[in-house]
């Protein structure tokens, strides 16, 4: 058995019905679309969500929410990533230089994920309550 000799079992794959190829095929002339009407035309049919002229559901329901533009330029940093750094002071520029966060990030927040044993000084970064406790327990400090 080789890759070039593999083929499906006999009768496993059935050829698709060819529409509009004569009355003998069973799907000739109108091609299974019926006579006249919007759906029989090429390019016919209604758009998704169309309810026959009734006010559609997506317009009946109120709008809600928004996309925060600040969230697009905010990165999250995990505690174990701080432990990998060779520096004792951490700020946003160091995180960008070490490629822990994308260069276009303007803000960063440290979250509690993993552990940290080395004392580090955090400058100008957001820190969650759990991460703050872990950093201070390791002997580090947070400068706003």
UniProtKB/Swiss-Prot annotation:
One GO MF term attached to the UniProt entry: rRNA binding
Ordered alphabetically, the record's keywords are: Ribonucleoprotein, Ribosomal protein, RNA-binding, rRNA-binding
Q: Name one GO cellular component term.
A: cytosolic large ribosomal subunit
Q: What are the start and end residues of every segment in region (Disordered)?
A: 1-53
One Pfam family linked to the record:
Ribosomal_L27A
- Residue ranges annotated as transmembrane are none
Gly residues bias: where? 21-31
Q: Which domain of life is it from?
A: Bacteria
Q: Which GO terms describe its biological process?
A: translation
Subunit structure, per the record? Answer: Part of the 50S ribosomal subunit.
What task does this protein carry out? Binds to the 23S rRNA.
Q: What family does the entry list?
A: Belongs to the universal ribosomal protein uL15 family.
Q: Which NCBIfam families match?
A: rplO_bact
* Protein name per UniProt: Large ribosomal subunit protein uL15
Which source organism does the UniProt entry give? Hamiltonella defensa subsp. Acyrthosiphon pisum (strain 5AT)
